[in-house]
Amino acid sequence: MRQAFGVDHTRSSSVRLRFAALLALVAASLIGPGSRSEAKGREQKTAGLPSTDELPGFQQTTPLWAWADFCNRHRSECASDAADPSVVRLTKATWDTINAVNRHVNATIKPLSDQDHWGMVDRWDLPEDGYGDCEDYQLLKRKMLAEKGLPRRAMRMTVVIDDKREGHAVLMVRTDRGDFILDNKTNFVLGWNQTSYTFVKREGDDGASWVSLGGVIPPFATANR
C-alpha cells in the first residue's frame, strides 16, 4: 500500500508540474506578444528621431533690456505657468511641427536690422509687418509653437555669439532627447552641440529671469576654429 501510494504521489506531482508549465506557456502567449508589441510601438515612435545633449544653465543672470521691454509690451508672450513641463516629450509629430514652423518663419519673414526697422540698436518684437531681426524670427516661432501646444517653459530664447563673433539670438527647444536650436540662419533644426555658436545665456524657468550658459562652446565649433 505504501509503495502504491508513493507511485500515485509521484504521478500527482508530475501532473501538477506539467500543468504549471502549461499555465506559464499560456500566460506567455497572452502577455508576451503584447509586451513585445508595446516595446516595438515605443521604438517605432522614436525611430528616426534625433538626440543630442542637454545644455545645463548656471547661476541666474540679468535679462537683456530688450527682452524686458518686449515683455512689458507683450505680457502674455512672457507668461510662464510653473505647472507646465520644462521639457517636451519628442515624438515624430512634435519634431515635424518644430521643423515646419522653423522653415515657415524663415521663408516668410524678411531680414531687417533693428536700426533700419525701428531706429534703435536693439528692439525685440513680433514681426507683424513681415520684417525682423534674428530675435524677431525666434519670437514668432515661439508664439506659433505655443499655439500648437508646446509649453512656453520648454522654449527658451537664447543669446549666442555667432561665427562672425557677433551677438545673435536663437530659440532653444528643450526635449527629453536633448536641447535643439531653431535659427533663422538655417532651416535645419540642430542639437545645440552641432552649431558653431558660443552660448551666453537663455531664459530661465519662470520667463522673467535668465540663466548664464557660461560661454559654452560646442565641440563641433571648437574643432572648426
Regions found by a protein language model. Give the residues of each.
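N-terminal secretory signal peptides that target proteins for export/translocation
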Residues: M1-V15
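Sec-dependent N-terminal signal peptides
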Residues: R18-A24
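Helix-centric, low-specificity signal for extended rod-like, repetitive segments
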Residues: H9-R11, S29, C134
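Short alpha-helical segments used as structural interaction elements across diverse proteins
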Residues: S13-V15, P33, Q138-L139
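Generic secretory/membrane-interface signal
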Residues: R2-Q3, S29, R75, R177
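C-terminal segment of classical bacterial N-terminal signal peptides
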Residues: S29-R36
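A structural boundary/capping signal
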Residues: R36-R225
